[in-house]
Amino acid sequence: MADEALQHTFFA
């Protein structure tokens, strides 16, 4: 999974 995807998920 892309790192940026996780940031947009958890760091909303």
Swiss-Prot record:
Its EC number is 4.2.2.7. Optimum temperature is 45 degrees Celsius. Keywords: Heparin-binding, Lyase. GO terms for molecular function: heparin binding; heparin lyase activity. The keyword tRNA-binding does not apply. The N-terminus is blocked. Optimum pH is 7.2. It catalyses: Eliminative cleavage of polysaccharides containing (1->4)-linked D-glucuronate or L-iduronate residues and (1->4)-alpha-linked 2-sulfoamino-2-deoxy-6-sulfo-D-glucose residues to give oligosaccharides with terminal 4-deoxy-alpha-D-gluc-4-enuronosyl groups at their non-reducing ends. It comes from the Bacteria. Inhibited by Cu(2+) ion, lead and some agents that modify histidine and cysteine residues. Activated by KCl and by reducing agents, such as dithiothreitol and 2-mercaptoethanol. Degrades heparin and heparan sulfate. This is Heparin lyase. It comes from Bacteroides stercoris.
